[in-house]
């Protein structure tokens, strides 16, 4: 029995993965956490929950755009919760720091963790990507639940920051 060795990825493949994760993070954070969030917040009545309501609206749209067609109801529902929690966490991070750069870095890192195993040909793990869509990285129930456990406290902190906002 030989020892497991990670698959070898070409530098070009790793560069494409990095550029894709970073480019997606930059575009989505600007679009959702800066432009859309400010537009929705500006349209809402002043008040303690204005920023949180704007974040929830933008997070719902973000979630809808990230849901692939999925057959089973439970994985689809968990994926929706996962994406929504991620979006709230990013909104809270932007609110806390006043900058997009930390959210862009966190978003790019999260995407890299989700997509690198599939790009590198690693399968059979909690990160295995379904054959039907690259938009659903956590196809195993344990991977999905682990991701939700990681995202829930970050989203709760995001909500707290949004409620404390201007």
Regions found by a protein language model. Give the residues of each.
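Helix-boundary and loop/linker segments of multi-pass membrane transporters
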Residues: 5-14, 44-48
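Small-polar-interrupted transmembrane alpha-helices in polytopic inner-membrane proteins
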Residues: 21, 51-67
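Membrane-interface helix caps and helix-loop-helix hairpins in membrane proteins
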Residues: 2-8, 67-76
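Membrane-embedded alpha-helical segments of multi-pass membrane proteins
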Residues: 11-19, 27, 31, 80-88, ...
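Hydrophobic residues within alpha-helical transmembrane segments
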Residues: 57-64, 77, 81, 105, ...
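Active-site His/Glu-centered metal-binding helix of metallohydrolases
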Residues: 26-31, 35-36, 40, 64, ...
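Membrane-interface helix/loop boundary segments of multi-pass membrane proteins
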Residues: 27-57, 92-99
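C-terminal membrane module of polytopic membrane proteins
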Residues: 108-166
């Amino acid at each position: 029995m030989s020892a497991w060795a990670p698959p070898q990825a070409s530098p070009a493949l790793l560069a494409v993965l990095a550029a894709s994760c970073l480019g997606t993070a930059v575009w989505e954070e600007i679009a959702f956490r800066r432009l859309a969030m400010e537009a929705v917040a500006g349209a809402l009545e002043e008040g303690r929950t204005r920023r949180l309501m704007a974040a929830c609206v933008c997070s719902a749209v973000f979630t809808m755009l990230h849901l692939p067609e999925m057959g089973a109801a439970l994985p689809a529902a968990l994926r929706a919760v996962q994406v929504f929690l991620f979006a709230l966490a990013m909104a809270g991070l932007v609110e806390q720091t006043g900058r997009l750069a930390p959210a862009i870095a966190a978003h790019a890192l999260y995407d890299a963790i989700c997509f690198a195993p599939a790009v590198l040909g690693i399968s059979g793990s909690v990160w295995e990507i379904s054959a039907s869509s690259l938009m659903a990285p956590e196809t195993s129930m344990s991977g999905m639940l682990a991701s939700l456990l990681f995202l829930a406290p970050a989203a709760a902190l995001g909500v707290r920051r949004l409620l404390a906002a201007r």
